[in-house]
């Protein structure tokens, strides 16, 4: 941002005709009643009840000493001063020259006209707006205010930048870097990246910017390590001797083999890490599928007579009756392709935990049908009779399967081909599927040690 320089001037310095100021003289100090020292001009002209005027400063000083008009001695309080609108309007119409017509500083207390200054003559009331836009106002050099002390007119800044200021940024014609004008010659002679310099190792002429790359990859006289240092060869030699060095020791076969063995070891470690991460990923996916099905995707009926989360319902602790409601069925078909299962929340009969595993698009090679299985978290062998019933919008078409199975491990039991997953068959009304669950543990095979 341009740093504007505020000029020191009075109305007497800029008035076109000095006689025009006579009606506006303060009766005490004889200066103008308008204060031109303020940043924002105030045109208020204050008078006593008899019409005598003074500047604001003199009114304040006079009334603090004695509350009377210094001209007519009439009693006057600060609150009784009134504005002289006629004089205010007359003052606004006075013609003045732009203060930027003068040089930056006065000479022996007098404003000095400058031939390069602003030629504008305008009314007093337009002066404040003009000064904000005037291209002849003085500003500090914007390039480096801590170094360049130049104060210039705003309309000369371009010339100052291009021809005068030592701190303006000039683009180097060779490397395009922006450099201060005073440093440009030194930059071109000794610092520019495109400067051709001599390599201290091989005496080749190389661009300064490319010297590091030359030493790292090309210079024949640069000392380097063997390509097979990782294989045990620790010799150093000039780059120009690389071919000769590699031909030694039976063409470095021993060191090459060491490098290959090292790479094989690293590859084996990577494979082990990969298999470990792959297993962790599978485990996490299983947990995620279960959480999705239990938290976001399913509803378990929790009426007391249908066995909530506690010790079972129905006729005793060996019986469970409930239902599993699966909402957003169309989304489940998309999210669970063939062989991907959706699991119900756990439910409990006595101390035994169960859950339902459902395949919306079928398991293995079964397509077009739902696959459904009952799983028992294995604690001890149990003979279980269970039924799973798909509820239809027409109750006469409900589909129920019943089976008795001896659960002796963690494997599930159920039907690969259960109901068709057609949206029009009445099982998926309101985009949801409801499965009634009935389970009875006929016999627990407890292990007893005496």
UniProtKB/Swiss-Prot annotation:
Tell me the Gene3D superfamilies matching this sequence: Apoptosis, Tumor Necrosis Factor Receptor Associated Protein 2, Chain A, Zinc/RING finger domain, C3HC4 (zinc finger)
Q: Which domain of life is it from?
A: Eukaryota
Name listed for the protein in its UniProt record: TNF receptor-associated factor family protein DDB_G0273433/DDB_G0273509
Q: Where are the zinc fingers (TRAF-type)?
A: 129-185, 186-243
Function field: Probable adapter protein and signal transducer that links members of the tumor necrosis factor receptor family to different signaling pathways by association with the receptor cytoplasmic domain and kinases.
Could you tell me which residue ranges the MATH domain spans? 319-439
Q: Which UniProt keywords apply?
A: Coiled coil, Cytoplasm, Metal-binding, Repeat, Zinc, Zinc-finger
């Amino acid at each position: 941002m341009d740093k504007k320089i505020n000029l020191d001037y009075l109305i007497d310095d800029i008035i076109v005709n000095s006689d025009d100021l006579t009606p506006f003289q303060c009766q005490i100090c004889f200066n103008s009643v308008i204060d031109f020292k303020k940043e924002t001009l105030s045109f208020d002209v204050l008078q006593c009840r008899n019409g005598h005027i003074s500047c604001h400063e003199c009114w304040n000083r006079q009334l603090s000493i004695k509350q009377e008009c210094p001209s007519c001695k009439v009693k006057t309080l600060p609150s009784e001063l009134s504005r002289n609108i006629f004089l205010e309007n007359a003052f606004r119409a006075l013609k003045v020259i732009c203060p930027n017509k003068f040089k930056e500083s006065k000479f022996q207390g007098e404003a000095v006209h400058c031939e390069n200054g602003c030629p504008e003559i305008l009314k007093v009331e337009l002066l404040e707006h003009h000064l904000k836009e005037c291209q002849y106002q003085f500003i500090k050099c914007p390039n480096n205010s801590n170094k360049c002390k130049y104060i210039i007119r705003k309309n000369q800044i371009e010339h100052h930048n291009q021809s005068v200021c030592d701190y303006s940024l000039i683009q180097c014609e060779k490397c395009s870097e922006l450099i201060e004008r005073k440093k440009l010659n030194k930059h071109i002679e000794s610092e520019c990246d495109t400067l051709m310099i001599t390599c201290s190792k091989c005496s080749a002429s190389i661009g300064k910017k490319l010297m590091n790359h030359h030493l790292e990859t090309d210079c024949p006289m640069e000392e380097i390590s063997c390509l097979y240092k990782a294989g045990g060869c620790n010799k150093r030699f000039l780059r120009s001797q690389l071919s000769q060095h590699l031909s030694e020791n039976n063409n470095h076969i021993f060191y090459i083999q060491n490098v290959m063995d090292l790479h094989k070891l690293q590859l084996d470690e990577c494979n082990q890490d990969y298999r470990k991460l792959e297993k962790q990923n599978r485990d996490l996916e299983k947990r995620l599928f279960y959480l999705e099905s239990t938290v976001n995707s399913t509803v378990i009926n929790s009426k007391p007579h249908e066995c909530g989360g506690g010790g079972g319902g129905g006729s005793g602790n060996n019986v469970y009756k409930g239902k599993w409601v699966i909402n957003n069925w169309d989304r489940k078909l998309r999210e669970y392709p063939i062989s991907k299962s959706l699991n119900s929340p756990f439910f409990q009969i006595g101390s035994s935990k169960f859950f339902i595993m459902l395949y919306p698009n079928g398991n293995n090679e079964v397509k077009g049908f739902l696959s459904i299985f009952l799983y028992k978290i294995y604690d001890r062998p149990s003979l279980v009779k269970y039924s799973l019933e798909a509820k239809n919008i027409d109750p006469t078409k409900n589909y129920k399967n019943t089976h008795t199975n001896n659960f002796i491990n963690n494997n599930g039991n159920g039907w690969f081909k259960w109901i068709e997953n057609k949206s029009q068959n009445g099982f998926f009304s309101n985009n949801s599927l409801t499965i009634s669950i009935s389970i009875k543990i006929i016999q627990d095979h407890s292990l007893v040690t005496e």
